[in-house]
Amino acid sequence: MNIALVAHDKKKDDLIVLIKTYAHILKKHQLFATGTTGKRIAEATGLPVHCFRSGPLGGDQEIGAAVARGEMDMIIFFRDPLTAQPHEPDVSALMRLCDVYSIPLSTNMGGSEILIRSIEQGDFESLKLSHNDEPPA
């Protein structure tokens, strides 16, 4: 699976805790992330992470484009709901694309743990078959 990992500044440490905890599962998948988040994850875990640009510099949009092309299977995005983000429209657009293309999206630790454990159980096999270039009708 192709999994995108994104975290706002105040949530990066939480995301790293999650990735360390589930590294034994995530190492079997291709990990993608926005710039700083990806670098921090790679440094903290040793896992290979393909880094897009930083979120405010277009990284969220790059991940969104990958979603639209059917190249992402899951998004874990630890958002900071208490801090205004200058690129909030990009964040909203990414979340919208996840809804349009039925891509699992989690924005917090609890939901992310459920998604990652579901990967381990093979619960997303049918999802791979449903991806295509056209949004559902």
UniProtKB/Swiss-Prot annotation:
Q: What is the lineage of its organism?
A: Bacteria, Bacillati, Bacillota, Bacilli, Bacillales
Q: Where is the MGS-like domain positioned along the sequence?
A: 1-137
**UniProt key word Magnesium:** no
**Which positions make up the signal peptide?**
none
Family of this protein: Belongs to the methylglyoxal synthase family.
Gene Ontology CC, one term: cytosol
The chemistry this enzyme catalyses reads: dihydroxyacetone phosphate = methylglyoxal + phosphate
The name this protein goes by in its record: Methylglyoxal synthase
In the UniProt record, what gene is named as encoding this protein?
mgsA
Q: Which CDD domains does the entry link to?
A: MGS (cd01422)
Give the first-level EC class, as a single word. Answer: lyase
Q: What is its EC number?
A: 4.2.3.3
Active-site residues from the entry: D60
Enumerate the InterPro entries for this protein: Methylgl_synth (IPR004363), Methylglyoxal_synth_AS (IPR018148), MGS-like_dom (IPR011607), MGS-like_dom_sf (IPR036914)
What is this protein's function per UniProt? Answer: Catalyzes the formation of methylglyoxal from dihydroxyacetone phosphate.
Q: Which GO terms describe its molecular function?
A: methylglyoxal synthase activity
